Design a protein with these regions (language model features):
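Short loop/turn segments at secondary-structure transitions that flank enzyme active sites
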Residues: 10, 39, 66-69, 90, ...
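Aromatic-Pro/Gly-enriched surface loop or interdomain linker
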Residues: 1-27
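Long, C-terminal catalytic modules of enzymes
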Residues: 71, 75-186
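Short alpha-beta junction capping motif
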Residues: 27-70
Length: 186
């Protein structure tokens, strides 16, 4: 939000929890929304709300990474409790028997991709790999010069690297650790 404030933009903050409970009606007043975070853990209600918003002509600036990855739910009784059943992803551990299903809904956990809701279908890119290493900045690509999206790049030079500075997590650059990619097969 620092950049929005520095540029004197009026904005509202909507949390994942708000979106889960209130649905697409919460988004409908806005022409454009943006994810300024790491929206990795989204529930079906959140995905449905975003999909409905986009289908109604809303626009999304997806500024995060590794988004919309794990099947997630917010407990309808203990509303402060988020449940995630991780299996089938990067295999940082193996789920034990009986741990593939969410206890709050009975639905299969794991990856949204395995449930037919790949993030690539929603936002064009999705998580594909992770690993340590020196991060890198981004160079503008030809589509970034399309007049329809020129406002996104106001103040950024044609040859300027995006994220060409140290960061707090992986030492340097706008990209590192987790990698998203396009996949037209999904």
């Amino acid at each position: 939000t620092d950049w929005l404030e520095a540029q004197a933009f009026d904005f509202d903050v909507i949390t994942d929890e708000d979106l889960h409970w209130e649905g697409s009606a919460l988004l409908s007043p806005y022409r454009v929304i943006l994810t300024g975070s790491h929206p990795e853990y989204w529930s079906e209600q959140m995905l449905d709300a975003l999909t409905d918003y986009l289908n109604q002509g809303g626009r999304l600036m997806y500024l995060g990474g590794n988004g919309f990855y794990w099947v997630t739910n917010i407990d309808p009784v203990l509303r402060h409790t988020v449940e995630i059943r991780r299996w089938g992803g990067t295999q940082t551990w193996g789920a034990q028997p009986g741990e593939h299903y969410l206890s709050t809904t009975g639905e299969m956990g794991g990856l949204w991709r395995a449930r037919g809701r790949a993030p690539q279908r929603l936002v064009g890119v999705g998580f594909t790999a992770q690993g340590p290493g020196h991060g890198m900045p981004f160079a503008r690509q030809p589509d970034s010069f399309d007049p329809r999206v020129s406002f996104i790049f106001e103040g950024i030079g044609d040859e300027e690297l995006i994220g060409d500075f140290p960061n707090l997590v992986m030492e340097y650059g706008a990209s590192s650790f987790e990698i998203d990619r396009m996949d037209f097969q999904l």
